[in-house]
């Protein structure tokens, strides 16, 4: 099966949340720390950045603030702690394209990413084994 990648997305500090994006036509560049992500940006072209607001090595949105200062035109999605209003306000004030809480469902996360990146039509791809079917199953999540 051939899947055409429609966007390069850098994720920072998301851990298991990255799995929710596996069905989208994205090339994921997953990093665990802000400093690691900053170094990777020297060599990688990205269409979007998705990051936790508070990273272990860069607190209070420092990574995203620095990134937005250099590349304000690139869409960013930020994960904040559920119920932390100060963090949410700070993330929204940074100019993020979307602010989600860490308890956001995978389905809503996928839909948000698809909408922000302009992935329209068939964007979620689920393959099943050839023994079950000759074709892949496609799911429409962005309208």
What are these regions (language model features)?
Residues 120-143:
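CheY-like receiver
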Residues 49, 76, 99-100:
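Two-component signal transduction core modules
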Residues 32-48, 56:
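Acidic, metal-coordinating helix/loop segments flanking the phosphotransfer/catalytic sites
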Residues 86, 104-113:
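C-terminal output helix
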Residues 42-44, 67-73, 94:
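Conserved phosphotransfer cores of two-component systems
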Residues 47-70, 84:
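Conserved phosphotransfer microenvironments
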Residues 62, 80-99:
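Alpha4 helix (beta4-alpha4-beta5 surface) of REC/receiver domains from two-component response regulators
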Residues 11-32, 36:
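Two-component/phosphorelay signaling modules centered on CheY-like receiver
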């Amino acid at each position: 099966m051939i899947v055409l990648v429609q966007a390069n997305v850098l994720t920072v500090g998301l851990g298991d949340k990255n799995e929710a994006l596996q069905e989208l036509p994205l090339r994921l560049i997953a990093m665990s720390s802000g400093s690691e992500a900053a170094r990777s940006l020297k060599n990688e072209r990205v269409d979007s950045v998705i990051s936790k607001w508070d990273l272990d090595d860069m607190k209070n949105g420092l990574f995203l603030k620095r990134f937005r200062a250099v590349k304000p035109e690139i869409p960013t999605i930020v994960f904040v702690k559920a119920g932390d209003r100060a963090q949410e306000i700070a993330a929204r004030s940074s100019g993020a394209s979307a602010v989600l809480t860490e308890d956001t469902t995978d389905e809503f996360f996928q839909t948000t990413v698809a909408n922000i990146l302009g992935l329209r039509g068939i964007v979620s791809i689920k393959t099943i084994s050839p023994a079950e079917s000759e074709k892949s199953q496609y799911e429409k999540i962005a309208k």
